[in-house]
Amino acid sequence: MEMFQGLLLLLLLSMGGTWASKEPLRPRCRPINATLAVEKEGCPVCITVNTTICAGYCPTMTRVLQGVLPALPQVVCNYRDVRFESIRLPGCPRGVNPVVSYAVALSCQCALCRRSTTDCGGPKDHPLTCDDPRFQDSSSSKAPPPSLPSPSRLPGPSDTPILPQ
C-alpha cells in the first residue's frame, strides 16, 4: 500500500498541475450579444451600441506545489476573429472627430490575454454606463444614431500577450 501511495504521489508531482475540471465548463468561451456604452471626450453625448463580445469560461491549470514550481500561465477568453465598426456621435463640436470605433467578435478562443483585443485589467464596475458623470443619469440616449456609417477595419495596438509575473 505504501508503494502505491508513493507511486501516486510521484505521478502527481511529475505532472506539475491538475485540470480544474475534466468536463467542459459551461458556458465556454464564445461570442455573446452585448450592449456597450459609447462616448468620446469632447462630445456631449453618450449612446449605447449592440455588438458581440467574447465571454465565457476557459479551462485552467494550477500547480500542486505552488510554492516550489513557477506559476502556470492562465488563459482568458479572447477574440480570435474580430472586425471593427464605426459610428458617428451626434452633436460633437467642430474640431472633435465624432467617429468612434468598437470591436465586433466574430469568433473567440481561450488564450493568453492580448492587449490589442482584450481588457486585461479586470471587470469594469459598470460596463453599460458612461464614464462622464454628466451621462450617468437617465438623460443619456439609449439608442444608436439613426444613420450608421459602414464598418471599417482599424489598425489595433501591438498584440503583446501578458505573461504571469
UniProtKB/Swiss-Prot annotation:
Misc: Encoded by a cluster of genes that have evolved by duplication from LHB. HCG-beta is encoded by six non-allelic genes (CGB) clustered on chromosome 19q13.3 and named CGB1, CGB2, CGB3, CGB5, CGB7 and CGB8. Two specific hCGb proteins that differ by three amino acids in positions 2,4 and 117 have been described: type 1 (CGB7) and type 2 (CGB3, CGB5, CGB8). The CGB gene first arose in the common ancestor of the anthropoid primates.
Keyword annotations of the record: Disulfide bond, Glycoprotein, Hormone, Pharmaceutical, Secreted, Signal
Keyword flag DNA-binding: no
The protein's name in its UniProt record: Choriogonadotropin subunit beta 3
Tissues/organs with expression: High expression in the placenta throughout pregnancy.
GO biological process per UniProt: apoptotic process; cell-cell signaling; female gamete generation; G protein-coupled receptor signaling pathway; hormone-mediated signaling pathway; signal transduction
Glycosylation, residue list: N33, N50, S141, S147, S152, S158
Family label: Belongs to the glycoprotein hormones subunit beta family.
UniProt feature, compositional bias: Pro residues: 143-154
Location(s) in or outside the cell: Secreted
Coarse class of the protein's main subcellular location: secreted
CDD domains: GHB_like
InterPro entries listed in its UniProt record: Cystine-knot_cytokine, Glyco_hormone_CN, Gonadotropin_bsu, Gonadotropin_bsu_CS
PROSITE patterns: GLYCO_HORMONE_BETA_1 (PS00261), GLYCO_HORMONE_BETA_2 (PS00689)
Disulfide bridges in this chain: C29-C77, C43-C92, C46-C130, C54-C108, C58-C110, C113-C120
Oligomeric and partner information: Heterodimer of a common alpha chain identical in LH, FSH, TSH and HCG and a unique beta chain distinct in each of the hormones.
One Gene Ontology CC term in the entry: pituitary gonadotropin complex
Gene3D superfamilies: Cystine-knot cytokines
Known role: Beta subunit of the human chorionic gonadotropin (hCG). hCG is a complex glycoprotein composed of two glycosylated subunits alpha and beta which are non-covalently associated. The alpha subunit is identical to those in the pituitary gonadotropin hormones (LH, FSH and TSH). The beta subunits are distinct in each of the hormones and confer receptor and biological specificity. Has an essential role in pregnancy and maternal adaptation. Stimulates the ovaries to synthesize the steroids that are essential for the maintenance of pregnancy.
Region Disordered: start-end pairs: 131-165
Signal peptide: 1-20
GO terms for MF: hormone activity
